[in-house]
Amino acid sequence: MAGSLSEIKAKIISTEKTSKITSAMRMVSSAKLVKSEQAARDFQIYASKIRQITTDLLKSELTIGSDNPMLVSRPVKKTGYIVITSDKGLVGGYNSKILKSVMDMITEYHADGDYEIISIGSVGSDFFKARGMNVAFELRGLADQPSFEQVRQIISQSVDMFVNEIFDELYVCYNHHVNSLTSQVRVQQMLPISDLVADEAAEEGVTGFELEPNRHDILDQLLPQFTESLIYGAIIDAKTAEHAAGMTAMQTATDNAKNVINDLTIQYNRARQAAITQEITEIVAGANALE
């Protein structure tokens, strides 16, 4: 019985230590989430402005017939997917949701292997390579608050692959942050830029201004920046969802640890009570034997 009590006590102490670790990790993820949410809000100001300007230029009569390759839809022979995952685990179902979605798309639409994968995140890279799937480019070790400089190269490589007709359309697959408890898998088309002409230009656009050298040249410079901003925005969004998933996972782990501790404590008290009862019984029996 003494051995059983010591084993239960050891389990309680071990679980309490685990609970402290997961609680600390939850607090760290929570702090990262707050920073990421603020970064996403700040970036949205820039993203909405560049979208407004780009839309307005595209709707003007001088550029509506632009032959910029980023605007031209062509027969789709191959599709590119930028897949954003985390670099580590402990984020609940964050990675499994997006990877399952990507694999379902590949199974349904790309049985002939007519796709290219650009992976951001070690989990995704390892997942695809373990299945013998080619990863054209990858980025590992993404910072908790990624700067544009850190992701500039892989974004530029993705855009160049489309422009050079290595693939004919480009999508970003990631977890969209809804709130601290919820994220949604999002598969968003980035290229060709097919939705802008249909958008309504903002009330205060640029069509009323004289632009130099000309609208075509400005648009040619602006479109890559616009596409890069869309992809970078998706990366920030995905990072925010990752931190939220990490916070939720660690909160769940902490709650589960507390439940285990409660169950073990009850088990310990019952075992201790049984041991005391047995000792009393033995003492009484011994006393009776001496009479």
Swiss-Prot record:
Q: Which UniProt keywords apply?
A: ATP synthesis, Cell membrane, CF(1), Hydrogen ion transport, Ion transport, Membrane, Transport
Q: Which GO MF terms are attached to this record?
A: ATP binding; proton-transporting ATP synthase activity, rotational mechanism
> What Gene Ontology cellular-component terms does the record carry?
plasma membrane; proton-transporting ATP synthase complex
Write out the GO biological process terms: proton motive force-driven plasma membrane ATP synthesis
Q: How does it sit in the membrane?
A: Peripheral membrane protein
Q: Where in the cell is it found?
A: Cell membrane
Annotated InterPro entries: ATP_synth_F1_ATPase_gsu, ATP_synth_F1_gsu, ATP_synth_F1_gsu_CS
PROSITE patterns in alphabetical order: ATPASE_GAMMA (PS00153)
What family does the entry list?
Answer: Belongs to the ATPase gamma chain family.
Assembly:
F-type ATPases have 2 components, CF(1) - the catalytic core - and CF(0) - the membrane proton channel. CF(1) has five subunits: alpha(3), beta(3), gamma(1), delta(1), epsilon(1). CF(0) has three main subunits: a, b and c.
Describe its function.
Produces ATP from ADP in the presence of a proton gradient across the membrane. The gamma chain is believed to be important in regulating ATPase activity and the flow of protons through the CF(0) complex.
What this protein is called in its record is: ATP synthase gamma chain
Q: What organism does this protein naturally occur in? A: Streptococcus pyogenes serotype M1
Taxonomy-wise, where does this protein's organism fall, top ranks first?
Bacteria, Bacillati, Bacillota, Bacilli, Lactobacillales
